[in-house]
Amino acid sequence: MIEIDGSFGEGGGQILRTSLTLSVITGKPFRIFNIRANRPNPGLQRQHLWAVKAMKMISNAETKGDEVGSKELIFVPHEIKGNTNIDIDVGTAGSVTLIIQTVLPAIINKNVRIRIKGGTDVPKSPTIDYIRLVYLEILRKIGIEAKLNLIKRGHYPEGGGEVIIENVNGNPSAFSLLELGKLTIIKGISHVSSLPAHIAERQMNSAREILSKLGVPIEIETDVRQGEVSKGSGIALAAIGEKSIIGADSLGERGKRAEIVGEEAARILINNLNTKASVDIHMSDMLMIFASLYGGEYIGAELTSHAYTNMEIIKKFLDIKIDVSGKRPFRFKAKIF
């Protein structure tokens, strides 16, 4: 059984999520201890527990310690269940997108349909529009297709969002994403839930004003939803090049003007573009697991503590070589084979 110290590196939920994904894919059981030991609320929290439950349902796993507050978990996966529907409710505003990142690599070509309820647009995780505009589009470039249906949005603290992910199929193989290529267009989605529509327009216009200096077409749509459980706003942007995509997002909050939200996302996007990387900071971390499974190389915008931690966890499950050139917190090249 693979032994994992949950306090290693950045010591957060990413260690658990990466372990769960690779355990289900490889069939290798693991024991993780000191779960989130250095965090203010150590042990498994509800959204981490739902990642465990989701992967348990997918793989008919045996578990011990899967309860809120637990600092140790044993996870023994069995064969992945195909042709099945799974419902996951991470509660209030638990991150839907972190659950997507955990389960998606494990359900490729398994005909699994997953309904996830919780927070679609919440702090400290990619927004659902980033997942749609950037994450899924880059996966398409490496041979993985997935259908994502956003039924309801959920913001902090009430949540209430709902997403269905299905038809995750493909024939992924080793990939090379070493440049963005010529920038062709910037796409985006500016949204509001149960707030005035002009907020989405102001976010969009603010971002557009800053991005206009890039000299490419800009297509930002607005998504205005009334009657949602939670109130909130945000914007996600995708700079689409001939070979890759760079993304950014920003969320509204009480006291934060709509113009600031749009400006923030635009400046984050430009900062990522200025690194001359092939993928942004979010994707630098998220792409590593796919490169580890299929072989790949890419240039990430920033070598984060998440990335370092991921490397060590991945090597516990897979017999691979990870060659990384670059220093924190700057851009880096990852080659995994």
From Swiss-Prot:
Keyword annotations of the record: ATP-binding, Cytoplasm, Ligase, Nucleotide-binding
UniProt enzyme class: ligase
EC number: 6.5.1.4
Reactions accelerated catalytically: a 3'-end 3'-phospho-ribonucleotide-RNA + ATP = a 3'-end 2',3'-cyclophospho-ribonucleotide-RNA + AMP + diphosphate
GO biological process, one term: RNA processing
Main subcellular location of this protein, as a coarse class: cytoplasm
GO cellular component: cytoplasm
Sites where the protein binds ATP: 101, 282-285
InterPro entries found in the cross-reference section: RNA3'-term_phos_cycl_insert (IPR013791), RNA3'_phos_cyclase_dom (IPR023797), RNA3'_phos_cyclase_dom_sf (IPR037136), RNA3'_term_phos_cyc (IPR000228), RNA3'_term_phos_cyc_type_1 (IPR017770), RNA3'_term_phos_cycl-like_CS (IPR020719), RNA3'P_cycl/enolpyr_Trfase_a/b (IPR013792), RPTC_insert (IPR036553)
Presence of keyword Zinc-finger: no
Cell compartment(s), UniProt: Cytoplasm
Record: active site: 306
Matching Pfam families: RTC (PF01137), RTC_insert (PF05189)
HAMAP family listed in its UniProt record: RTC
Family: Belongs to the RNA 3'-terminal cyclase family. Type 1 subfamily.
Function recorded in the entry: Catalyzes the conversion of 3'-phosphate to a 2',3'-cyclic phosphodiester at the end of RNA. The mechanism of action of the enzyme occurs in 3 steps: (A) adenylation of the enzyme by ATP; (B) transfer of adenylate to an RNA-N3'P to produce RNA-N3'PP5'A; (C) and attack of the adjacent 2'-hydroxyl on the 3'-phosphorus in the diester linkage to produce the cyclic end product. The biological role of this enzyme is unknown but it is likely to function in some aspects of cellular RNA processing.
Record-given protein name: RNA 3'-terminal phosphate cyclase
Protein's organism: Saccharolobus islandicus (strain L.S.2.15 / Lassen #1) (Sulfolobus islandicus)
